[in-house]
């Protein structure tokens, strides 16, 4: 089997539907037969909630980073969950030598059957996000269709560049995703134009449409692919683009096309 590829999914701030993107992208990839591990690296634990993992589930990613558990021991139904204890662990890591390498070292022991790992980064560009970028092969940046979308992506790109230059020279930008956009509005269309003018083909062709259905599916811990298949088609298209930008997934792309 090819080497596992890791994607850090990040945004400059919260509210960009980043966690929904990780949840649904993981689901779409799994349905295409891609063995996918999701990691919740946000102390708020929203991804864990979305996957219906109990808040008291143990061990968590905090235990992995603190050296109390291995990555394999912390997997709950293809997810390594998080809770508020991760905030304490982040503070602890701040005084540790080689703190930026902690997650990469831990994931070196992850089960080899996983072909892809998706990391849901916290909505800040601090130590946990840096750990994710150092552990990752690719970065996927999400942006909401707002006035400051371009500025937020540029700030996230700066952190990606710093991680690449100082700690992870192999890190590549997988793409920029315009998330939760209403393309009927002028500001959504302008946000997409500005992103494409600035970042060109690195912006995914797929735009994720905004809908209250995403909040409903999260509340029910149910994938949007099942809750609203018409909206889920956006994520099937995005998964296809992601696989197209990664080496070694031609067969999975074919399976995904049949799902659509």
Stretches found by the model and what they are:
Residues 1-260:
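P-loop NTP-binding core
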